[in-house]
Amino acid sequence: MATAANRPDHAARRLFPWAVLTAVLAVALASPIAYSDAFVDTVLRREHLSAADLRARDAGRAVVKALDTSVRQELAYFGVVAINASPERFIDRFADIVRFERGPGVPQIGRFSASPRAEDLAPLALPPADIAALAKCRPGDCALKLSADAISRFRDRVDWSSSNVSLQVNAVARDMLLDLVRKYQARGNAALGEYHDDDEPLSVAHEFRAVLASSHPLPLPVPRLLAYLDDYPHNRPAGATEFFYWSVVDFGLKPTVRVNHVVIYPLDADPSGVSHVIAIKQLYATHYFRSALELRFLAAGQGPDPRRFQLLSLTRSRIDGTSGVRGSLLRPIISRRSRNAVRGYLEHLKRQVEVGQPPASQACSPAADAQVCVEAG
């Protein structure tokens, strides 16, 4: 019969297995995970990731490498990050783009309705510096990327001597972006028009096709998806879904208004283990970017845990300010900062999917099938 003196020993023996299990789990969770998947390993070898890069990936950090490009005005990056969640959870979170994207570098964001309408852009407010610059905007000399028609709109529809210039400018900007998305949905790349902010007009569709025509191999060929991005709105791949959103991004340079077209393309039972490919096609940006395309490959593969996957990212963009002596000095700086921004964004994706709790300092409000989000306070 147990006595009062030996009862603690029995209790200790009962607790011992749980203590050991807890310790083992703690060590396992704190240790890097050595991902081993034939498809992803092949891609990473092809991109010449180092042993240090792989250790960083296994430790849960995003790894980003700058890629060589054939022209100076193009930047390209390959990235990988391991995410402790299923690809399905990622897609579910990502589809709620307003909550997913918002953060310190994204003070404003909204998703367009299935049939875009003015209310989708109601919260959009241009940065004060952009409003001031628009007062001096002329074809061939404008601080913002605008078509000749848009420059005329700001000149003709805004009373620049009025006390409510900001309200008028923002109203014109919202109308301009709404028209852009509607026309793009009807006519595709032809509706993207030309930028007339510099001496030489720049065809946005031409810049996008140059990005699309890159010879750098993709992690996995997706010809139907690429053809759709080029031929939109025709021949959408079976099973693909899409949406459009706008945002104001601010990562330390000029805050930039961007409009993006997102296509989520599922790959059923692909031998590679890639379950989805996500394309993010830039339609417009007020600064820096002439065109941009990001492709994300969600590779579950045969890793140690089906609840984990690896996200492979390939980003290409055409940018300003890389010509001449000044451009040769600036390009390495722009490239380094852009690479750091891509790395930071991939780690943001990881946090959003693994935790995904919206910060209390921001507020979102649904507007039918659209969403808008602005920084609170």
Language-model features, listed with the residues they occupy:
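Short glycine/proline-centered loop/turn elements that form peptide/ligand docking sites
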Residues: 96
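Terminal "cap-and-tail" regions of soluble proteins that handle hydrophobic small molecules
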Residues: 35-89, 99-365, 372-377
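Bacterial N-terminal signal peptides
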Residues: 18-30
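Short, well-ordered alpha-helical segments enriched in acidic and aromatic residues
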Residues: 92-93
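Intrinsically disordered, low-complexity polyampholyte segments enriched for Lys and acidic residues
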Residues: 6-9, 369, 375
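Intrinsically disordered, low-complexity serine/threonine-rich segments
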Residues: 19, 368-370
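N-terminal secretory signal peptides that target proteins for export/translocation
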Residues: 1-13
